[in-house]
Amino acid sequence: MSTPRPEAQANSTLRVTQARVMRSEWTKLRTQPGALWSLLSAVILVVAFGILYSLLRVARPPHGAAAASFDPTSVSLAGVQLAQVAAGVLGVLLITSEYATGLIRTTLAAVPRRLPTLWGKAAVVTGAVVAVSVPAAVAVFLAGQAILGRQHLSTSFGEPGVARAVIGGALYLAVAALLGLALGALLRSTAGGIAALFGLLFAVPILVGFLPGSLADEIGKYLPGTAGLAVTTVHPDPVTSLSPWTGFGVFCAYALLLLGAAAVRLRRGDA
């Protein structure tokens, strides 16, 4: 009977796998202060702004036609619109910090095929954001409905579309983090990645808003943020929004398209 050579055993032990790459990326995320602060900021923004906006709506309750179209779920989830910035910045930092310090050369030397590194970062940032944003979304929904209940404006998880909107808010933040990761991988600059993120989510919708009314509505509903946030509403306005899952699908398509472009650059470009 022949025994494996020590060299073969060593090569097997040191073989790069996607699971090992993901463990490495998870360690980087846990030990990077900027990333952890971004994750914490996302949770705080979801909860704090959701509660604050619920209090404001109780102080100024809707009347007439506004009361008929009032969406208590989206009120509680209003913080998602701010938290998307923190989630996106988390994605940017997860890769641009390595370019800033030069660690990316060591990372790519350890993972010569390169792409498993990007997929590992994508999996880790998605998992981390979902893990904290689902409890945050559920908590702020319950808190917001308790506040809105003072004016009999509340709803419950049992109502159609409510659970989807709450979980959709958490999923939206996860995709926002992927969007940030893709932009960071493409631009390889923290400032550039964050600026591009702000431009895509905030500046472009403002510019589109200057177009003639119907054209602005038609184009606006397909923009990343507007499309994705449709999943956080129970009854989206068909004039200005896509249906919930269609809108979320469009948002995912933006993230995947940019992630694909980032993969091409990572595979072909220099570190």
Q: Language-model features: where?
A:
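Actinobacteria-biased recognition of intrinsically disordered, low-complexity terminal regions
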Residues: 1-27, 256, 260-271
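Secretory targeting signals
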Residues: 2-15, 35, 39-91, 118-185, ...
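Short hydrophobic, aromatic-rich alpha-helical segments embedded in or entering the lipid bilayer
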Residues: 21, 215-236
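Alpha-helical transmembrane segments and their helix-start/interface "positive-inside/aromatic belt" motifs
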Residues: 23-41, 125, 194-195
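Membrane-helix interface segments
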Residues: 34, 113-115, 189-193
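Membrane-interfacial segments
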Residues: 56-61, 99, 103, 143, ...
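Transmembrane helix boundary and interhelical loop/hinge segments in multi-pass membrane proteins
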Residues: 88-110, 114-115, 122
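Transmembrane helix segments
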Residues: 190-225
